[in-house]
Amino acid sequence: MSTDPLRCAGALIVDHDGRIFFQRRSPHRRLFPNCWDIVGGHLEPGEEIDEALRREITEETGWILSHVLGQVGEYHYVGDDGLARIEYDFLVRVDGDLDHPTLEAGKHTEYRWLAEHEVTVLDENRDVNDGLIRRIAEEGFAVLRSIGL
């Protein structure tokens, strides 16, 4: 069995008001149940990061990746399932009806577009020492500011 971390791709989807899209994971999910999260997931065998990013956006929202605005970061963590992961997160724009995402059935229960001053909501249902999704969001908003959006 490989000890290499699972590779993941994540999308911080930005709307025209400079808000970022988050979705709540279903309460029965093994990893981070009932927590807010960005769009993303594990790379399939043989898949490149950009391919996984495109696939995950469409699977989880029904939207189509239009362009990547920049990389937010590379995050190493161990999930509450005990598996090590390395996650590559990107700030992106998408094509589609941003008011009506098609959430992936059984995996997500609701969504929100958050402005930078609203990121504290991301701490809901998270372990007090976690803070990863909020840090990713804060770094995403910093990238947005750095590129003038």
Where are these regions (language model features)?
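A structural microfeature
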Residues: 22, 70-73
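Conserved N-terminal beta-strand and adjoining loop/helix that marks the start
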Residues: 1-20, 91
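A short local loop/turn or secondary-structure capping micro-motif enriched for an aromatic residue
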Residues: 29-32, 109-111, 131
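Charged phosphate-binding loop/patch that engages nucleotide di/tri-phosphates or the phosphate backbone
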Residues: 128-149
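Conserved Nudix-box catalytic region and its N-terminal flanking loop in Nudix hydrolases
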Residues: 19-59
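Short secondary-structure boundary/capping segments
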Residues: 3, 12, 28, 82, ...
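Short connector loops at helix/strand junctions that flank enzyme active sites
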Residues: 6, 33-38, 83-87
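Unchanged
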Residues: 43-67, 75-127
